Amino acid sequence: MEQEPLQPRQGDLNWRLSAHPVTLLCFLGIRLSALLMYLFGILFIKHFILVFIITLLLLAADFYYLKNIAGRRLVGLRWWNEVNTTTGDSHWVFESSDPNTRTITATDKRFFWLSLYVTPAFWIGLAILAVIQLSVIWLSLVVIALVLTITNTVAFSRCDRFSQASTFANRALSGGIVSNIAGGLLGRLFK
């Protein structure tokens, strides 16, 4: 009796199942390259300043790509911060794609959210290591990385909650609850 090889299923961590494999690979590549440059850059590039600058540029690229491209293409979410010029107040704006017009694959969602939450955990570990080693200059770079990654993590988490709440409200108003209540009331009137 011969067993069939397991076929990859939607939701597996296999980039070939992604609806947007180029976006996914660029997202993971940029995200991983900042960590790798921080960890191993000094082995290949002997100048600390150059490693610092390259890591900082990779962190900025990661922040931008995640916020503006990967978030929108992989999970249909986007966020930004607006400042009212008259009062100076700032507020977060969340945008999600219409669930009826856009299909988001389980694989893309899984890669996105796993990477979104695991990366700050790595940077927290590196911050603890920098504190233990009393390396203030490396700690400054890790703090910048933490600010950028945690900002994206918090913003996308809020955006996802906002998206789920608005989707629930739209479904309730568009057909589910409202039509049941209206049907029940009309049914009682014409009995």
UniProtKB/Swiss-Prot annotation:
- Name the major location: Golgi
Q: What's the superkingdom here? A: Eukaryota
Give the bilayer topology: Multi-pass membrane protein
Q: Where in the cell is it found?
A: Golgi apparatus membrane
- Kindly list the GO CC terms recorded for this protein: Golgi membrane
Keyword terms, alphabetized:
Glycoprotein, Golgi apparatus, Membrane, Transmembrane, Transmembrane helix
What biological processes does GO assign it? protein secretion; vesicle-mediated transport
InterPro entries for the chain: TVP23-like
Q: Which residues are glycosylated?
A: 84
A Pfam family per the record: DUF846
Instruction: List residues traversing the bilayer.
Output: 17-37, 39-59, 111-133, 137-156
Protein family membership: Belongs to the TVP23 family.
Q: What is this protein called?
A: Golgi apparatus membrane protein tvp23
The record's gene field reads: tvp23
